[in-house]
């Protein structure tokens, strides 16, 4: 049985700073894509870390360092705080108001099927709002919603301000809009500590919903905004590939 040693930094302010920097240096995937010189970031933030006297001061320095990645999926957690990168939405005007939609478009007259809010709009247009891919979508929920829209001419799927969640729910929803095996995207794995150490991309596919399930093959408009994030973005990217779908 083979084994290898794992380098551990000292449990000190500088040891913890270096450990965090090294973990990202070896495992983070998007330095080149984001144009981040991680070595330059180290040189800039290490003196700030060296001046720290408490864990909370170090946390703040490390959080600012991670913000250089401009990545909403990179967080730093401690017993007293969790850091998030927010500027991907906080630096821009908010362009979605759920109450405005419920009041002026749905007139507070809507149905709820699990995590899906839905209603028939004028001119026989179906409207479905899905607020979070963390909320499970049941197959029965989808059958009920799509059956309700049987006479609709088109369908609006609103994923504005949807912060993402479970990729399984993305697949469950997309399967209702395809007729057969459909390319959904590509996955690439990091294979080593170098910034360019990646395996070849491999494709993954979604299959159409099982026989007997209600499908929708008429026109679809997907509404998204800057706060459509993570798994919700993946949903939009897959739906964009379908010929009956328009992204707004």
Task: Indicate where each model-derived feature is located.
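Short, well-structured beta-strand/strand-turn elements
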Residues: 155, 229, 242-248
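Short, well-ordered coil/turn elements that cap or connect secondary structure elements
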Residues: 122, 215-217, 242
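Flexible, low-complexity junctional segments that flank or bridge functional domains
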Residues: 2-206, 219
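Short, conserved helix/loop micro-motifs enriched in His/Cys and acidic residues
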Residues: 210-223
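Active-site neighborhood of thiol-dependent amide/isopeptide-bond enzymes
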Residues: 224-231
């Amino acid at each position: 049985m083979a084994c290898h040693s794992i380098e551990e930094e000292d449990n000190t302010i500088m040891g913890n700073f270096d450990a965090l920097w090294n973990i990202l240096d070896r495992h983070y995937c998007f330095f080149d894509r984001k144009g981040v010189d991680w070595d330059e970031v180290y040189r800039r933030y290490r003196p700030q870390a060296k001046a720290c006297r408490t864990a909370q001061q170090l946390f703040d320095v490390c959080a600012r360092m991670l913000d250089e990645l401009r990545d909403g999926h990179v967080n730093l957690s401690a017993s007293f705080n969790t850091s998030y990168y927010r500027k991907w939405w906080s630096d821009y005007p908010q362009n979605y108001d759920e109450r405005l939609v419920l009041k002026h478009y749905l007139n507070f007259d809507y149905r709820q099927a699990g995590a899906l809010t839905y209603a028939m709009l004028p001119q026989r247009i179906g409207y479905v709002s899905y607020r979070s891919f963390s909320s499970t979508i049941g197959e029965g929920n989808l059958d009920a919603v799509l059956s309700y829209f049987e006479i609709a001419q088109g369908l609006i799927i609103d994923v504005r301000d949807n912060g993402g969640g479970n990729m399984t729910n993305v697949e469950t929803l997309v399967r209702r809009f395809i007729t057969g095996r459909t390319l959904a995207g590509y996955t690439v794995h990091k294979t080593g500590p170098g910034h360019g150490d990646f395996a070849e991309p491999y494709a993954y596919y979604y299959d159409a919903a099982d026989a007997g399930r209600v499908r929708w093959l008429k026109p679809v408009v997907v509404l998204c905004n800057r706060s459509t994030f993570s798994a919700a973005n993946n949903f939009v990217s897959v739906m964009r590939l379908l010929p009956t779908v328009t992204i707004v």
